[in-house]
Regions:
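Conserved class I S-adenosyl-L-methionine
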Residues: 1-38, 143
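Class I SAM-dependent methyltransferase SAM/SAH-binding core
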Residues: 44-46, 50-94
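A conserved beta-strand element that flanks and buttresses the S-adenosyl-L-methionine
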Residues: 105-106
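A short His-aromatic
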Residues: 112-113
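A short glycine-rich, Lys/Arg-flanked "PGG" loop and its adjoining helix->strand segment in the class I
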Residues: 119-131
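Acceptor-substrate binding/catalytic loop of class I
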Residues: 148-164
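Conserved S-adenosyl-L-methionine
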Residues: 174-180
Length: 180
């Protein structure tokens, strides 16, 4: 994980500049928010990056956002854009906020964790989700690890098998509402 953090520290500006703003994630975010009552619209955004476009969309949809990212450079960008929200430099693997959220989003972040760390995240998700809260995360289609090249530097990705994700979710009190 330190390599991923270092990657984003070194490339925050370039990644933010190149990150699409067209919000291809909108369908998933709308499905996440639809059943959540207005008073529960406090979203924990794990691996929030620079806040674009996910946090912006959540904020514009009336959510309060608490964003967590291991990269201080990314958090600085989020805080500059959305100073009324809460932004913290923390490692999601050791998160202990003593707060529960109506929704947790880990979009394009969770898959940067090693497989053993992904397994260990499910109790952390459970500890931070409100009753009837919803969890949205991205993963790969099958168990495996990959190191891609971005900006001439290696960037780690991993995924468990979808069946293992379903088992981990069930063991931690989650029900799969949609998988695609």
């Amino acid at each position: 994980m330190s390599e991923v953090r270092e990657f984003y520290e070194a490339n925050a500006g370039a990644f933010d500049r190149d990150r699409g703003r067209e919000l291809m994630e909108r369908t998933y975010l709308d499905a996440l928010l639809a059943p959540i009552d207005a008073q529960d619209r406090h979203v924990l955004d794990l691996g929030c990056g620079a806040g674009e476009p996910i946090a912006r969309y959540l904020i514009e949809a009336g959510c309060r956002v608490t964003g967590i990212d291991a990269s201080s450079a990314m958090i600085a960008l989020s805080a500059a854009r959305f100073p009324d929200m809460t932004w913290k430099v923390e490692d999601m693997r050791t998160l202990a906020l003593d707060k529960r959220f109506g929704a947790i989003v880990a979009w394009d972040s969770f898959f940067h964790l090693r497989v053993e760390d992904q397994r260990a995240m499910f109790p952390i998700f459970r500890a931070h989700i409100a009753p009837r809260g919803l969890l949205l995360f991205t993963s790969g289609p099958a168990h495996g690890e990959a190191i891609n090249d971005l900006y001439g530097q290696p960037l780690y990705h991993a995924s468990l098998d979808p069946g293992e994700y379903r088992s981990l979710l069930a063991a931690n009190g989650f029900e799969v509402l949609r998988h695609s």
